[in-house]
């Protein structure tokens, strides 16, 4: 594990340990702090291991590049980039990961939704004509959880 801030590193470890104490094995000597902490965290992994990049996207490409150099498979959260030059850099790094036979995945929650895939296919097949502008909005209310407390009877759902 790695972070720039001690309190965030501690909180991440605490949250992971709380939910799955038997599955979390990150002793203090494998929790790294600082701007180069990502390198220290990857240095303790072996080629073929998996690294999770859940950092702000501005830092994604140097971390991805280092993971490729170390022969690590990568799971990264979206967004992957924030601008054109960085996007081109990520495409180049993606090609390098393919050359090294590394697996790379991105946390795109809608990518595997059958209804959205069908919508994509219909748009691509021209069912709504030529597109000059497309805006999409994801409208959702509060997300439920198995761990959510029940709403008090005197509380409105429209807060």
Task: State the predicted function of each range.
Residues 1, 51, 56-57, 68:
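Mobile, glycine-rich extracellular loop/lid and propeptide segments
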Residues 5-9, 37, 59:
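Conserved short alpha-helix immediately C-terminal to the canonical SAM/SAH-binding motif I
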Residues 8-15, 43-44, 61-66, 85-87, ...:
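Short, solvent-exposed loop/turn and secondary-structure capping segments
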Residues 19-53:
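A structured beta-alpha segment of the ubiquitous adenosine-cofactor-binding alpha/beta core
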Residues 27-29, 46-51, 69-73, 99-103, ...:
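Loop/turn elements at helix/coil->beta-strand transitions in domains of secreted/extracellular proteins
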Residues 57, 61-112:
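Beta-strand-loop-alpha-helix segment that lines the small-molecule cofactor/substrate pocket
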Residues 100-105, 110-159:
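Predominantly a Rossmann-like dinucleotide-binding segment in NAD(P)-dependent oxidoreductases
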């Amino acid at each position: 594990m790695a972070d720039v801030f001690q309190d965030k590193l501690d909180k991440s470890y605490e949250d992971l340990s709380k939910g799955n104490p038997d599955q979390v094995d990150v002793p203090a000597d494998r929790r790294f702090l600082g701007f180069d902490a990502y390198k220290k965290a990857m240095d303790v992994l072996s080629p073929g291991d998996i690294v999770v990049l859940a950092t702000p996207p501005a830092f994604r490409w140097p971390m991805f590049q280092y993971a490729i150099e170390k022969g690590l498979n990568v799971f990264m959260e979206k967004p992957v980039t924030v601008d054109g030059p960085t996007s081109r850099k990520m495409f180049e790094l993606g090609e390098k990961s393919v050359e090294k036979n590394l697996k790379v995945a991105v946390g795109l929650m809608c990518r595997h939704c059958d209804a959205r895939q069908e919508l994509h296919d219909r748009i691509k097949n021209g069912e709504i004509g030529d597109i000059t502008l497309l805006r999409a909005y994801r409208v959702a209310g509060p997300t439920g959880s198995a761990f959510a407390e029940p709403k008090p009877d005197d509380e409105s759902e429209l807060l």
